[in-house]
């Protein structure tokens, strides 16, 4: 296991709720604040971190306020017809073309940037550190929520789906790799705990083509709440600070 330095920044995903961490990271950029040794992002959190490491304040706010709301991105009709609810291919193509990403800034930063993904064939979490050339595809994989996005994203011959399925907030992994001072940017208020899924049978049926994902999808709440317990009661010698949205945040 690759060891990292002591100071880690972890950014939770959460679709549109990622606008909260986006705002914090934009402020960090304005203040030139980046005292971290490693970066960990899942789903929308990975996308926000990419803009932060590319030093592009305001970039992802445009995605939340404009591109994410366009009919090209979310299409229930397409999903009913057997396609994807979210067109991640369109999202990455159009935003890379119109907003760009500073590849040279990303390449110049030697600090590891881990993207949390879930293997489609066994439901296990993996933490990938892609090259700049593979970053967009890996971010797409980290955001490919099963059911909403039907077939996962293939990276080096392996299919992956949203990292939030197996490990939504990779605090334990960061600790295992040597992080002792951890900041977590959350997408949910501090009081939030994930509930058991309401439609277990429906989820199982919709995932019949990917049986290895059924159990991880139905037990997400258990792992998520265990991570919250770890954040609130870290092991001796580990300091964890979480920054959460206000209680009314939806």
Indicate where each model-derived feature is located.
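Patatin-like phospholipase
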Residues: 1-40, 50-250
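Gly/Ala-rich beta-loop-alpha elbow adjacent to hydrolase catalytic centers
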Residues: 41, 45
């Amino acid at each position: 296991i690759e060891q990292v330095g002591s100071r880690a920044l972890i950014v939770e995903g959460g679709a549109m709720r990622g606008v909260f961490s986006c705002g914090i990271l934009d402020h960090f950029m304005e203040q030139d604040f980046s005292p971290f040794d490693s970066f960990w992002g899942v789903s929308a959190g990975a996308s926000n971190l990419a803009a932060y490491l590319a030093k592009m304040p305001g970039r992802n706010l445009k995605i939340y306020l404009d591109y994410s709301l366009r009919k090209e991105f979310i299409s229930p009709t397409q999903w009913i017809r057997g396609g994807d609810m979210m067109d991640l291919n369109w999202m990455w193509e159009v935003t890379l073309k119109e907003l760009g990403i500073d590849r040279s800034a990303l390449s110049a930063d030697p600090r590891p940037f881990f993207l949390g993904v879930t293997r489609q064939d066994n439901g296990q979490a993996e933490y990938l550190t892609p090259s700049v050339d593979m970053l967009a595809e890996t971010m797409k994989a980290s955001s490919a929520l099963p059911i909403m996005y039907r077939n996962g994203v293939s990276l080096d011959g392996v299919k992956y789906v949203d990292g939030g399925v197996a490990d939504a907030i990779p605090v334990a992994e960061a600790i295992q790799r040597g992080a002792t001072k951890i900041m977590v940017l959350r997408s949910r208020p501090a009081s939030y705990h994930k509930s058991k899924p309401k439609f277990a049978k429906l989820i199982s049926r919709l995932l019949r083509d990917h049986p290895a994902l059924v159990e991880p999808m139905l037990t997400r709440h258990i792992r998520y709440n265990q991570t919250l317990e770890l954040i609130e009661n870290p092991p001796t010698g580990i300091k964890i600070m979480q920054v959460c949205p206000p209680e009314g945040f939806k």
